[in-house]
Design a protein with these regions (language model features):
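N-terminal auxiliary segments of SAM/dcSAM-dependent transferases
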Residues: 1-76
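SAM-dependent Rossmann-like transferase core, predominantly class I methyltransferases
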Residues: 47, 57-126
Length: 126
């Protein structure tokens, strides 16, 4: 049976929320968008379009994976970091959001200190 895209998002939000996924609506939207390989614009403008049974089943499988605790990045094998997508799998740690902040601050301050001798210490890396 073909469902509307927005219905799948609602169903996904409900299932994810009931399984304890934080920010379930965001994750449901992300899973649907990534499963269908849509750009943000395509995703936004296709909310009232019907999705094929095959696509719907793929989305549902990905929702189920997420309810089992599998991160979205591991479901799709990709993680965005600093505006780039990196391939990830079960053997790779996902970059943390605060790491992006550290990179941004380093780049921002690099030109202020580039002629000075500095020491860096990186703690807690795998």
């Amino acid at each position: 049976m073909n469902k509307l895209l927005k219905s799948l998002i609602y169903d996904g939000k409900k299932v994810l929320s009931e399984s304890g996924v934080k920010n379930a609506i965001h994750e449901a939207r992300l899973i649907v968008k990534k499963t269908l390989k849509k750009t943000e614009l395509e995703f936004i403008t296709s909310q009232d379009k019907k999705i094929s049974s095959k696509q719907s089943n793929s989305i549902i499988r990905n929702f189920i994976e997420r309810t089992k605790g599998k991160p979205v990045s591991k479901i799709f094998g990709l993680k965005e970091f600093f505006s780039n997508e990196f391939i990830v799998n079960k053997n790779v740690l996902d970059p943390r959001p605060e790491t992006e902040l550290l990179v941004e601050l380093t780049i921002k301050n690099f030109f202020k200190i580039r002629d000075k001798k500095i020491s860096l210490l990186e703690l807690g890396v795998g």
